[in-house]
Amino acid sequence: MSAKLIKGTEIREEILKEIEAEVKEIKEKHGKVPGLVTILVGESPASISYVTLKIQTAHRVGFKEVQDSQPVDISEADLLALIDKYNKDDSIHGILVQLPLPKHIDEKKVLNAIDPDKDVDGFHPVNVGRLMIGGSEVKFPPCTPAGIQEMIVRAGVETSGAEVVVVGRSNIVGKPIANMMLQKGPGANATVTVVHTRTKNMDEHCKRADILIVAAGVPGLVKPEWIKPGACVIDVGVNRVGEKPSAKDPNKMVAILSGDVDFDAAKEIAGSITPVPGGVGPMTITMLMLNTLKSLKFKLGLI
């Protein structure tokens, strides 16, 4: 029997509708809307595409959206001054700097210059510390881990007391989702194991998992025999493994994407599983919108 598909595309639509409704209500009662600025340095096609998607989504849910494009040769000092301007702008509640930045700019210095109360990506050291403490201290959880947790909750997967195995220890996904699953609350209270490139007998750890979260960036790393029957499998990996003609235009080639899990085989064993694409990916920008809305609500004293 095939596993239940946990589709990020469907959950995204549910959440965006909820955000849009709440934005309208806050605007009617308080005369304010969330403001999100995305700072883009240079003209990388991939970065432009991603920023455009963020701006379009912000517009859709009723935010004030600002795309601030800067030349690739902007100085570090000028970029820091720009961030300081938005830190002081009361109409802006979320500040994003699209990465990567040019080599002459210190990314760490730039990201740390963002006001932690406007750091809706959740990567400022202050917000990382808040996440570690947990509970009411958490303001802005990192977007991809937050999306994973939201998918698990909305799919009705029991986490309390569950064995969770996280494959990967990155600061962006692995470490934060492991910490979030340990916390008290919905989508948490789990017993968590993190495995990585130096882990011995990785497959034996994975076989214990009631919930297996894979964020290694290695296509097909997790084999079907690693999966516990009935487990929930969250595949965070998005790997380009080739090209194929586009269905819309056969003369145009598009990427073939693969996750970190052997999906076709795994779906015959797992109880539920995320597809690639269409699984975790759509949730990242969605949770970015939710964090920006939360920033305004913090400002208004609504939470």
Swiss-Prot record:
Residue positions annotated to bind NADP(+) are 168-170, 197, 238
Q: What does this protein do?
A: Catalyzes the oxidation of 5,10-methylenetetrahydrofolate to 5,10-methenyltetrahydrofolate and then the hydrolysis of 5,10-methenyltetrahydrofolate to 10-formyltetrahydrofolate.
Report which gene this protein is encoded by: folD
* SUPFAM superfamilies hit by this protein: Aminoacid dehydrogenase-like, N-terminal domain, NAD(P)-binding Rossmann-fold domains
Keyword set includes Cell division: no
Q: Which terms are listed as keywords in the entry? A: Amino-acid biosynthesis, Histidine biosynthesis, Hydrolase, Methionine biosynthesis, Multifunctional enzyme, NADP, One-carbon metabolism, Oxidoreductase, Purine biosynthesis
Q: What is this protein called?
A: Bifunctional protein FolD
Its assembly, as annotated, is: Homodimer.
Pathway(s) of this molecule: One-carbon metabolism; tetrahydrofolate interconversion
**Protein's GO biological process:** L-histidine biosynthetic process; methionine biosynthetic process; purine nucleotide biosynthetic process; tetrahydrofolate interconversion
Q: Which GO terms describe its cellular component?
A: cytosol
Q: What is the similarity comment for this entry? A: Belongs to the tetrahydrofolate dehydrogenase/cyclohydrolase family.
Q: Which reaction does it catalyse?
A: (6R)-5,10-methylene-5,6,7,8-tetrahydrofolate + NADP(+) = (6R)-5,10-methenyltetrahydrofolate + NADPH; (6R)-5,10-methenyltetrahydrofolate + H2O = (6R)-10-formyltetrahydrofolate + H(+)
- Matching HAMAP family, A to Z? THF_DHG_CYH
Q: Pfam families, per this entry? A: THF_DHG_CYH, THF_DHG_CYH_C
According to its UniProt record, the EC number is: 1.5.1.5, 3.5.4.9
One Gene Ontology term of the molecular function aspect: methenyltetrahydrofolate cyclohydrolase activity
What InterPro entries does this protein's entry cite? Aminoacid_DH-like_N_sf, NAD(P)-bd_dom_sf, THF_DH/CycHdrlase, THF_DH/CycHdrlase_cat_dom, THF_DH/CycHdrlase_CS, THF_DH/CycHdrlase_NAD-bd_dom
